[in-house]
């Protein structure tokens, strides 16, 4: 069974391993720590110089050299302390920058499945809050611990040399302070750990609600979300109060111990001064050294508390860094993407015992339009995720021509796919940046304008004050739904994909926007292998092939007319769409 010491080492090992992964400058870090040590050693001279000053104090004996020496020591200590603090903070920031870069690089390369199962707010908290915990340890508490140890040992050594009897009295204070501070430190760690977790949860809640504030307002759900947020705030408040209660004990208890020690030293030391066994200067030095023993005890205790917090933060960061990355480069390059896509008995479930798709087989012809229709929850969107290779089939194979798609690199596969989703998400930035998003090559203004023109987006872009340099806002909120879709179509046109995947959403647009988007889509679909989750009857009627997906299975395939004659559920779908179109026309009339 591992001992307490072995457990402590096993917990520290991952922490130091993580710090090493940031490639810190050990020389600069050692130099900064060495400066802190020198600062502490210099501070140990001050009580001795004060002793000499007090013992030889008289107006006639007061020399400028003595005063100058004490002043010099003070200035040297202050200067070294300032530079050591800066150097430690600089190195700490470099390490944290390296940690954040490691985490960011990992997060960007993690598969979609990770983000489907982990709240984005909690992940953000790991990159921001947890790294700050480690930074505080490196920049403040490690140096405080080392200098604290040196200060305590150095002070006690000097005191023993000066007067061993009085030093024994001081030594009683050290274990007494430890008995008080160590349990408080453990309690602080427990509360801090809970606070970190609660902060991550609260950050997750904010990231969930604020991006969807329009839905909140449209649903009159402000009070509901206020209640959820208030619960998180209340939990953080309670943890803050618990932390304040513990912290409120530290200062008074240290003061109590210090005052008790001070009274004992002054009382016993005063007796020795009266008997001539101790000089007045030595007693003053004793009192100053007493402060240099008690105060670092608090630093040492805080170090262990912060170390425990950092170990907890490290464990969570290591969990992210241990996740398997999505390999985008291994595999062949696609030389010809104008080939049929074949689904051969494809099954998939997010959980092994709950299949969403069950032995789906189909051929998506190259250069033609395949429309996927069916009731909600049938598996249409999941099928898209498999085709994009966000997930791999649980069973079965997806092929391009005769080759399984997983023999091609993800990078090559996704280069040949253009995806226009229902939401048509845009990144914060300009219209130009969004149209060129993801392209590694340089794109000319003429190419951007041509893509925008083909997407029926050029006219509205030209009407904007800054045209292509117009900021679209967070998630493209400054643009309308139809404008966002046309920007997404322009982006897809610029990529010039062989395979187009479209999750149709024109039903949510006004008639003019719908017409513009439909025209843009027709241009985009021309000559490409197109797979569309269809909601509009016009798309279905014009498609070369329909796949009717329900309950994870393809229950019908063929043209619109063939399915109207043979598939009852499809016929209901088509008639419902016809009725909706007629209602819209009547309203428009």
UniProtKB/Swiss-Prot annotation:
Provide the protein's localization. Cell membrane
Where do the ABC transporter domain residues begin and end? 341-576
Q: Which UniProt keywords apply?
A: Antibiotic resistance, ATP-binding, Cell membrane, Membrane, Nucleotide-binding, Translocase, Transmembrane, Transmembrane helix, Transport
Q: According to the UniProt entry, where is the signal peptide?
A: none
- SMART domains recorded: AAA (SM00382)
The positions flagged as active site in the entry are 504 (proton acceptor)
Q: What is the effect of changing residue 380 to A?
A: Complete loss of ATPase activity
What domain of life does the UniProt record list for this protein's source? Bacteria
GO MF annotation list: ABC-type transporter activity; ATP binding; ATP hydrolysis activity; ATPase-coupled lipid transmembrane transporter activity
Activity regulation (UniProt): 50% inhibited by vanadate; it has been suggested that vanadate fully inhibits the dimer but not the monomer. Activated by 15 uM reserpine then inhibited by higher concentrations.
Please state what is observed when this gene is inactivated: Not essential.
Tell me the enzyme class: translocase
The record places domain ABC transmembrane type-1 at 29-309
Provide a GO biological process annotation.
response to antibiotic
Q: Which GO terms describe its cellular component?
A: plasma membrane
Give membrane topology per the record.
Multi-pass membrane protein
Q: What is its EC number?
A: 7.6.2.-
Q: Share the entry's pH-dependence remark.
A: Optimum pH is 8.0.
Stored InterPro entries: AAA+_ATPase (IPR003593), ABC1_TM_dom (IPR011527), ABC1_TM_sf (IPR036640), ABC_transporter-like_ATP-bd (IPR003439), ABC_transporter-like_CS (IPR017871), P-loop_NTPase (IPR027417), Type_1_exporter (IPR039421)
Q: Which amino acid positions bind ATP, per UniProt? A: 374-381
The record describes its quaternary structure and partners as: Homodimer.
Q: What does this protein do?
A: An efflux transporter able to transport Hoechst 33342, ethidium bromide, doxorubicin and a number of other drugs in vitro into inside out vesicles. The endogenous substrate is unknown. It has been suggested that NBD dimerization induced by ATP-binding causes a large conformational change responsible for substrate translocation. Transmembrane domains (TMD) form a pore in the inner membrane and the ATP-binding domain (NBD) is responsible for energy generation.
Q: What is known of its domains?
A: In BmrA the ATP-binding domain (NBD) and the transmembrane domain (TMD) are fused. This is considered to be a half-size transporter that undergoes homodimerization to be functional.
Its family remark reads: Belongs to the ABC transporter superfamily.
What is the name attached to this protein's record?
Multidrug resistance ABC transporter ATP-binding/permease protein BmrA
Q: Which organism is it from?
A: Bacillus subtilis (strain 168)
Q: What is the lineage of its organism?
A: Bacteria, Bacillati, Bacillota, Bacilli, Bacillales
Supply the gene name. Answer: bmrA
């Amino acid at each position: 069974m591992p001992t307490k010491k072995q457990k402590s080492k096993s917990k520290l090992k991952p922490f130091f391993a993580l710090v090493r992964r940031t490639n810190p400058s050990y020389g600069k870090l050692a130099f900064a720590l060495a400066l802190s040590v020198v600062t502490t050693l210099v501070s140990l001279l001050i009580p001795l110089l004060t002793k000499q000053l007090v013992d030889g104090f008289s107006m006639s004996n007061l020399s400028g050299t003595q005063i100058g020496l004490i002043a010099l020591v003070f200035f040297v200590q202050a200067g070294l302390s300032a530079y050591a603090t800066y150097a430690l903070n600089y190195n700490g920031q470099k390490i944290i920058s390296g940690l954040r870069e490691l985490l960011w690089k990992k997060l960007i390369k993690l598969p979609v499945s990770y983000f489907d199962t982990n709240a984005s707010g909690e992940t953000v908290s790991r990159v921001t809050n947890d790294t700050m915990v480690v930074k505080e340890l490196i920049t403040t508490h490690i140096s405080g611990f080392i200098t604290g140890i040196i200060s305590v040992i150095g002070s006690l050594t000097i005191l023993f040399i000066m007067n061993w009897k009085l030093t024994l009295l001081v030594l009683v204070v050290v274990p007494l302070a430890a008995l008080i501070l160590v349990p408080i430190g453990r309690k602080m760690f427990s509360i801090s750990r809970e606070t970190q977790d609660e902060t991550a949860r609260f950050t997750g809640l904010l990231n969930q609600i604020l991006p969807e504030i329009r839905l909140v307002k449209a649903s009159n759900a402000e009070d509901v979300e206020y209640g959820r947020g208030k619960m998180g705030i209340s939990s953080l408040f309670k943890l803050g109060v618990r932390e304040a209660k513990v912290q409120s004990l530290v200062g008074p208890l240290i003061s109590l111990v210090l005052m008790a020690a001070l009274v004992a030293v002054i009382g016993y030391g005063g007796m020795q001064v009266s008997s001539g066994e101790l000089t007045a200067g030595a007693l003053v030095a004793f009192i100053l050294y007493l402060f240099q023993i008690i105060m670092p005890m608090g630093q040492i205790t805080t170090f262990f508390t912060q170390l425990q917090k950092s170990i907890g933060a490290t464990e969570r960061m290591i969990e992210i860094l241990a996740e398997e990355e999505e390999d985008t480069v291994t595999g062949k390059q696609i030389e010809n993407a104008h080939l049929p896509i074949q689904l051969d008995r494809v099954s998939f479930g997010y959980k092994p015992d709950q299949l969403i798709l069950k032995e789906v087989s189909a051929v998506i012809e190259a250069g033609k339009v395949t429309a996927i229709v069916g009731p909600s929850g049938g598996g249409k969107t999941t099928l898209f995720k498999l085709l994009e290779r966000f997930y791999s089939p649980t069973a079965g194979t997806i092929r391009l021509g005769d080759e399984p798609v997983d023999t091609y690199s993800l990078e090559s596969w996704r280069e040949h796919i253009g995806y226009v989703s229902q939401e048509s998400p845009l990144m914060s930035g300009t219209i130009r940046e969004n149209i060129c998003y993801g392209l590694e090559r340089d794109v000319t203004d003429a190419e951007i304008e041509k893509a925008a023109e083909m997407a029926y987006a050029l006219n509205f872009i030209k009407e904007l004050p800054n045209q292509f340099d117009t900021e679209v806002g967070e998630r493209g909120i400054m643009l309308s739904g139809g404008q966002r879709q046309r920007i997404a179509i322009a982006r897809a046109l610029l990529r010039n994909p062989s395979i187009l995947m479209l999750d149709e959403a024109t039903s949510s647009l006004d008639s003019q926007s719908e017409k513009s988007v439909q025209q843009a889509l027709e241009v985009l679909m021309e000559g490409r292998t197109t797979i569309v989750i269809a909601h509009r009857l016009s798309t279905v009627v014009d498609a070369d092939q329909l796949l009717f997906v329900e309950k994870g299975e393809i229950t019908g395939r063929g043209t619109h007319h063939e399915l109207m004659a043979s598939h009852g559920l499809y016929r209901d779908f088509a008639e419902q769409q016809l009725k909706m179109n007629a209602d819209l026309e009547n309203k428009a009339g």
